[in-house]
Amino acid sequence: MSLNRRQFVASSVALATTASASRLAYTATDKELDVIVIGAGLSGLESALTLEENGLRVRVLEGRNRVGGRVYSLFDVPGNPEVGGNTIANAYGRCIAAANRSGVEVVNLAPRLFGSRLGQEFFLGGERVDTRAWETHPRNPFQGEMRQKLPWTWSDAMFQKHLPFTDLENWHDPKHAKHDISVHDFLTAHGATNEMIDLGFNTNIAYGTTAYDVSLLQQAFSDYWQKVNRGAIMAFSRTGASNAPAGNTPVAQATTPGVPPGLLVGVFKGGNQRLPMAMAARLKGDLLLNQTVVAIDTTPGSASVTTADGRVHRAKAVVCSMPFSTLRNVAITPLPEPTQHKAIHTLGYIPITQFHLVAKRPFWENDGLSPGMWTDGPLGLVLPQRFGARDDEITSLTVWCRGLNGLYVDRFGVEAGKQLVLSEFARLRPASKGQLEVAATHSWTTDPFSAGDWAIFKPGQVTELRAALAKPHQRLFFCGEHTSVGSRGMEGALESAERVSLEVLTSL
């Protein structure tokens, strides 16, 4: 199927909103390509655009029937909530610049979120806990001054108090190799019990599956990125739970009480997926969707990519933005050197499953509680989305099931998983019974093109594997958020695109 650029833009919107089409491509005449880019997420698209701007002929292959990768907006759910790629902050300079280049408006949510400080409810063992009484609660496992910490703030406090080095920007430096241990070992060395770790780290985990499979250096990297953005997202915590709300770009003015001057909690107008869609529309070369890559062959002077339909795409070089969780299922010939091969096959990824619910009526007004919740059960985190016409309008609720909870919920399948979520809501919040509909659900773990959400370094992997992640393999080059070293998330994806573009331009 061949479309011109105007038709491509229109079709991209249709695909994102209806997912009714199976293939999309706008093709140039068949000629020798300079570069094939695998993946139409932020890193792949930015790499392709940069290489085209430098005169190279590029083709982008994407396995899904949409662009964006893990930047995924639900255009058919009120408010267009995000499944992945949630917000940007002041330190997301590359994202802001990419939006400016592509004509995508950045909206600052800080005034709205700080003006709606409803907090969140705390449910433990199926019972609501008054956060004001948590310090003396019989199920509080923490000790000493840490008993004052709510579960979603405990691990942050432990890391801030006990991290053994302060130059967090050098988290990957070999001099810190002795700290490439599990978070579990680190916390127990500082007096934490398994009960503390289970509640304060493993529940609604942000990195990994449990504290056993996350490196302390991974936490240092995450803490560094938090430190960079702390002035932008004051209430961000490792779990994603809020002690207060969140925010967006043009920087916030101090017109709303409690909003720090200059605060940005940014989203892209109409849904964050609008950014990769606009970037894709700027491409000059081919963008082929529904192209599942099964093999990559590389030599010192050329490379080729084979897709599941049997087609072989040839070019002088290949840029691969696939997460290692899916790249490990692709035949690479010749094999990468042993350390890189091991990284491809063992790098960790966090399990995350989301349910997006729409309320028929605002049941939280009936029970007098906040719609947001932090639970130790199947609901995990419940985050209200405020993308309506009014600042106080809640357009949907997002249920975040992370780590072991995400794996547990996935075992039910989609339909039974929906019923599990609705029944758990009704159990904890009786006023919600019959008032909620599951508008969408997505498991990043069972998604064949992601097999997990963001990358996680396991204990020992920073020391052994990190330096090999993005090492060029003949004419095969690597990018993606998992290869970034100075930033994370959407900004990390664009950081990796800068690096890989320079590598390719230097080699050709």
Spell out what each predicted region is.
Residues 4-508:
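FAD-dinucleotide binding site
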Residues 1:
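Flexible coil/turn residues that form the inter-helical turn or adjacent wing/linker of helix-turn-helix
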